[in-house]
Amino acid sequence: MLPTLDARLTAAAELVRPGQPVADIGCDHGKLTAVLAASGKYPKVIGADLRPGPLAKAKQTLENAGCLDRAELRLGDGLSVLSAGEVGSIVLAGVSAQTTWEIIEKAPWVSAVGGPRLIMVPATRHSELRRWLWQHGFALVADRPVQAAGRWYAVMAEEYTGKVTEPTFTQCLLGDTGRWPEGAGYAAWQRAKLPRMRLGVPDGSPLAAEMDAILKEGN
């Protein structure tokens, strides 16, 4: 039986480059790995996790879905399980923003023009991940807001171009989520955090002015 994906992983699956190998890093129970493998759209599907326990559960998920022969499971830390050029897309779902960029930093081959598409679903600190990616030469392909288990997530796809940009606070806060029907709900959720964030920003600073403008728009 094929596992059912929540809104986060469904959106992530839709952003994977078809016709190219894909890796699901931090695959946990292997639900996304199984769905990708069963689709037949990818010549190679790799599921990887740092811990043997989740990897064993991923194997069981693949067996139950009848696609164990169409996926490869690897035990290892982050992108160390991959070699440069091996996959066209890498999914990093369910880890923090900081963990995501630390994983990327440890694999310099990712930050190359023509490198893999990164599909990320940060569990926290969406704004900080957007800023880090843009400041390190990645360009936005998609930024989709989704709601799962009562929380908002941003499913981001980025590719390296080498063009470094310095985004505004507003760009980091909302990304390109406004083009989606769910964008208004995501924006309201992000804005709700601002009063607390604003407390630590000195009055009169450019950041304070930008935050105040966003708060005023929301009233």
Locate the predicted segments by residue:
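S-adenosyl-L-methionine
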Residues: 1-20, 34, 56-85
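Class I S-adenosyl-L-methionine
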Residues: 2-7, 80-81, 86, 98-219
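Conserved class I S-adenosyl-L-methionine
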Residues: 19-28
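Conserved SAM-binding loop of SAM-dependent methyltransferases across substrates and taxa
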Residues: 29-41
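Conserved SAM-binding motif I beta-strand of class I
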Residues: 44-49
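Conserved SAM/SAH-binding beta-strand->alpha-helix loop
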Residues: 51-53
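Short SAM/SAH-binding signature in class I
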Residues: 86-94
